[in-house]
A protein has these predicted regions:
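A nucleotide- and high-energy phosphate-metabolite-utilizing enzyme signature
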Residues: 1-270
């Protein structure tokens, strides 16, 4: 019940309007519910300065069909739009967006009836740090590797020693568990609900093979997964705050030993 996100890139929406309408009509006639947007190259700068959530739709794109040259020009324009100033603005906005979301949906990964997408430790926490990492490391944008974006992101964390290999493994397993729960919530309720209510917990526990009397063990596993996502996202957001939101000069850092130093209450690996 989650939409297929489809972005159509056009040199001129006015000129290509009939072809665009034909594509969308064919999808609907084929029973494919696509949430589509149509963009032109100037939209990159437009949404960069006006709409954070619309701009993030430009991340994680995969070329499917059409004019490869136009897609490459779009990709290059997206990369070039993210300079040091826009990095600071975007990451600052993402940090504030996380704060507001937690305020609205819950700032604890151990809520009794969490929103598996929006509450602390939910999928959007994972996606938010993924997007922030993309902004700070532009080669991650729009990777065409035959891996999920989550796997590409976690491989980047491991490769750059941003966390341990064991923690990366736990993070990916946690993400997959919460994602599976969301998929089953949509399937069992036949709706786009993300609220993990008590009735849904009982039903999904049985689908995961738990006995009726063992709901607590199932939810314990969910809370453990949500806590891992929350802990890693909190740690990475602290790092981004130091680097982009409230940067502190290197002269204010202090060496702890030959491997680690501390700056603005955050410990870094040399």
């Amino acid at each position: 019940y989650s939409d297929i996100d489809l972005m159509i890139i056009s040199e001129s929406i006015e000129k290509d309007a009939a072809d665009i309408q034909k594509v969308i009509t064919n999808l609907w006639d084929g029973g494919i519910e696509a949430s589509h947007t149509v963009r032109e190259l100037p939209d990159i700068q437009k949404y960069l300065s006006t709409d954070l959530h619309a701009f993030t739709q430009f991340f994680e794109t995969r070329f499917i069909s059409g004019d490869a040259d136009l897609y490459n020009r779009w990709d290059n324009a997206l990369h070039n739009s993210i300079d040091d100033n826009s990095k600071k603005i975007l990451i600052t906005n993402f940090v504030e967006d996380v704060r507001q979301r937690h305020e609205k949906y819950g700032d604890s990964p151990k809520m009794l009836e969490p929103n598996v997408k929006m509450s602390a430790g939910g999928l959007r926490d994972f996606q938010s740090i993924e997007w922030m990492m993309m902004i700070s490391n532009k080669p991650l944008l729009n990777s065409q590797h035959e891996l999920t974006q989550a796997e590409i992101f976690i491989n980047h964390l491991k490769k750059n020693n941003l966390t341990t290999a064991a923690e990366c493994k736990r993070l990916l397993e946690s993400y997959k568990l919460v994602l599976s729960i969301r998929h089953l919530l949509h399937t069992t309720t036949k709706s786009k609900t993300d609220r993990f209510e008590f009735s849904g917990q009982t039903k999904l526990a049985a689908m995961f093979g738990y006995e009726e009397t063992d709901l607590m063990s199932f939810m314990k596993n969910y809370f453990a997964a949500a806590n891992i996502i929350f802990r890693v996202s909190h740690s990475i957001i602290k790092k981004f705050k130091v680097e982009f939101v409230n940067p502190v000069p290197d002269s204010f850092s202090y060496d702890l030993d030959e491997d680690f130093y501390i700056k603005n209450k955050v410990i870094f690996l040399k």
